[in-house]
């Protein structure tokens, strides 16, 4: 798992996760805690990195924040996206976006269950980052508690899917989650649902798009990993089938590899590999970013938005909307972003969460 450190705040053991807000369009004002990951500040699409010195926000100075979420089926007949927010004992906010494929079984399961697998070990890692400790026990090349949590969640999901009939048993899903504290933001993602931070005129991508497309460094790394596992890429898809290279579920690329390979061999297909190892994995990229007084908005969305709007355009849209009318709530902004994606003729479901980080500043 790749880890990049920028900073974090504190997480308490035994946090209350008993309630969940997940509705078609909802907003809330709740205390903020934030986590972010990366050894370097993420990509900046509008200015070069390291040009301005970041100012830290005082620890344990939590304030109420505004956030909102909205979704739409778009042109699709079925809604496969899911999203959620949880307030962890007033000390940490958890946001999750899940883009399902092959049905909604996987995304629905992750919305309800993924956080349960991020147990005390994962929270301990988050707590270390929040306190400013190094990740000496969880290095970039070592097993990370969040990676372990995702792995266990994927195993449980595959068992769950195995109890379902066609076609749900073949479903899969992306997952992008963000933990927000007063001083940091932690993101962990699998797939191509994206988290983006607006920071004083700049745009910071807080997640990697896991797609087998060679136009980016991350994409080339995914292609290499797939080939090394015995897989192959055809028409920018894993084995010519799946558009994302990391995902939860998708049994045929994991426990069902032998059957999948046999099916390809029976057709006389050329250029196929051995599928010695799973070419599709649920291993997350984890990033930790330090909060700054320059932070504006956090946007987390499925690719139904990102297919028609890039990261900088989304942040500019949010800023422009708030500049026109500062009384807008984040659920208004999330709804407007989804509507813009639909008007831009997205071909997918669209789900979006917007968090106003300005309201948590001193």
Q: Where are the language model's segments positioned?
A:
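PP2C/PPM-type serine/threonine phosphatase catalytic domain
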Residues: 1-362
């Amino acid at each position: 798992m790749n880890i990049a450190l920028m900073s974090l705040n504190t997480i308490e053991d035994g946090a209350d996760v008993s309630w969940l807000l997940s509705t078609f369009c909802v907003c809330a004002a709740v205390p903020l805690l934030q986590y972010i990951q990366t050894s370097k500040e993420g990509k900046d699409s509008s200015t070069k990195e390291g040009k301005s010195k970041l100012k830290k926000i005082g620890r344990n100075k939590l304030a109420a924040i505004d956030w909102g979420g909205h979704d739409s089926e778009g042109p699709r007949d079925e809604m496969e996206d899911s999203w959620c927010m949880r307030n962890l004992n007033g000390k940490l906010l958890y946001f999750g976006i899940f883009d399902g494929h092959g049905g909604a079984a996987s995304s629905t399961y992750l919305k309800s269950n993924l956080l349960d697998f991020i147990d005390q070990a994962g929270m301990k890692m988050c707590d270390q980052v929040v306190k400013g400790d190094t990740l000496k026990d969880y290095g970039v090349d070592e097993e990370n508690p969040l990676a372990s949590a995702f792995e266990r969640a994927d195993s449980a999901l595959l068992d769950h899917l195995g109890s379902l009939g066609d076609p749900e048993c073949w479903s899969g899903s992306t997952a992008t989650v963000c933990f927000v504290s007063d001083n940091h933001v932690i993101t962990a993602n699998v797939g191509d649902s994206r988290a983006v931070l607006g920071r004083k005129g700049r745009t910071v991508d807080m997640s990697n798009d896991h797609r087998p497309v060679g136009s980016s460094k991350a994409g080339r790394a995914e292609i290499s990993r797939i080939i090394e596992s015995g897989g192959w890429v055809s028409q920018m898809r894993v084995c010519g089938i799946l558009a994302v290279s990391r995902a939860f579920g998708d049994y045929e690329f994991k426990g069902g590899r032998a059957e999948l390979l046999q099916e390809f061999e029976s057709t006389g297909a050329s250029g196929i590999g051995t599928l010695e190892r799973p070419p599709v994995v649920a291993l997350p990229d984890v990033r930790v970013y330090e909060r700054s007084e320059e932070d504006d908005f956090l946007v987390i969305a499925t690719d139904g938005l990102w297919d028609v709007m890039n990261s900088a355009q989304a942040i500019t849209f949010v800023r422009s909307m708030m500049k026109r009318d500062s009384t807008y709530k984040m659920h208004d902004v999330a709804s407007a972003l989804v509507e813009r994606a639909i008007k831009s003729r997205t071909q997918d479901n669209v789900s979006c969460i917007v968090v106003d980080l300005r309201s948590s500043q001193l």
